[in-house]
UniProtKB/Swiss-Prot annotation:
Function, as annotated: Seems to be involved in the regulation of chemotactic cell migration and invasion.
Subcellular locations according to the entry: Secreted
Pfam families referenced in this protein's UniProt entry, alphabetically: Uteroglobin
Protein name: Secretoglobin family 1D member 4
Species of provenance: Homo sapiens (Human)
Tissues/organs with expression: Expressed in all tissues; the highest level of expression is detectable in lymph nodes, tonsil, cultured lymphoblasts and ovary.
C-alpha cells in the first residue's frame, strides 16, 4: 500500500503541475481535508468519486496513520506546498 500512495502522489504532482509551480486548488483541498479533518469529512469527499469499498478502506487506513503525525508537523507539511 505504501507504494500505491507514493505512486498516487507522483501522479498528482505530474498531472497538476503548472508552470508557476502552484499546487492545483483541487489537490490542495483534497490534501487539506485528508490531513486536518475527520473521517466523516474524508468519506464525504471520497463519496463524490464513488470508489470501491476497498479503496475507501485503504484511504481511511492511511488517514489513521497520518493522524498520528503531530498537528504542528502536519501544518508545516501544508505550508510547504500551499504558498
Amino acid at each position: 500500500m505504501r507504494l500505491s500512495v507514493c505512486l498516487l502522489m507522483v501522479s498528482l504532482a505530474l498531472c497538476c503541475y503548472q508552470a508557476h509551480a502552484l499546487v492545483c486548488p483541487a489537490v490542495a483541498s483534497e490534501i487539506t481535508v485528508f490531513l486536518f479533518l475527520s473521517d466523516a469529512a474524508v468519506n464525504l469527499q471520497v463519496a463524490k468519486l464513488n470508489p470501491p469499498p476497498e479503496a475507501l478502506a485503504a484511504k481511511l487506513e492511511v488517514k489513521h496513520c497520518t493522524d498520528q503525525i503531530s498537528f504542528k508537523k502536519r501544518l508545516s507539511l501544508k505550508k510547504s506546498w500551499w504558498k
